[in-house]
């Protein structure tokens, strides 16, 4: 038996913040697990904006006790599925937890639609006609979420994780190091921002915020959902071209990342949604130099880790919101939204 590392459990810090007058489409989870409840399982969950809302899904949302978007529905459904599994007292491995939550969502969607196919969504005839050439476009109408799921084991002072999408795990150490063991997959945001930047010659007087709302950018947004659990025209998963999401489709199993992190010397470990990330500067977003992009990202994440270590999640969030508000036109920090939902579940060890 491995020796118990530390009798004192880590301190939990949690933020889950949405901009005023907007529904929070994130969710979070933090529960005890194991025979004595000595382990901690936590998750940061980000509902993905659904490109199209099928009538049966909208009718289901309208019957709920509170207004829900498809993204909020997906995030909360996944949270509740995870909680039920963890509540058994001896939950399975994190990868199994994640995949079973996705399967739960798939079963619920099949109960609504009859099948996870484009025809079953019963979209308006003109919309269906535009999409019918590619059955993979069913992804545009499926509610989806991404998440980072973590499990702290005090006996070994290690952290296991299972991950799908553009949420992330950030670990900071007392010696100044930090790591982000989760990879985001093929994100569409960079391509969307570059598309917006190309419009600057045609619309030089528009702030970048307005360029991101142009019809050309919105068209790319609509079809970017094709890359959720992406498969090629032959139905073969293409992990380097797609991004893992929990949308009920079984192809998710090819996109789940798992691993273990040694926490020796760690100050904190934090699962977070991308809205809690310090935004990338224009120099990082639009650079063509891979080494420069890597260096700027490392500097940005290092600064972020330092702010969280010093000020805590709430203090960091206050500074993040101030920086976003000071850039209302999205020129310093090119991004799709001024403020995104921001969620983090942090385990502080020192």
What are these regions (language model features)?
Residues 1-83, 136-144, 167, 245-262, ...:
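N-terminal entry segment of metal-dependent catalytic domains or homologous docking segments
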Residues 7-14, 127-134, 326-328:
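Short Pro/Gly-enriched beta-strand edge/turn motifs at strand-loop
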Residues 34-38, 154-157, 177:
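Short, solvent-exposed loop/turn segments that connect beta-strands within catalytic domains
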Residues 41-43, 163, 269-271:
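Residue-level marker for buried hydrophobic side chains located in beta-strands
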Residues 52-54, 159-160, 170-173, 180, ...:
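Short helix/loop capping segments that flank catalytic or ligand/cofactor-binding pockets
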Residues 57, 216-350:
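C-terminal catalytic subdomain
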Residues 63-117, 291-327:
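Helix-loop-helix
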Residues 90-174, 205-261, 332-339, 343-347:
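Catalytic core of PPM/PP2C metal-dependent serine/threonine phosphatase domains
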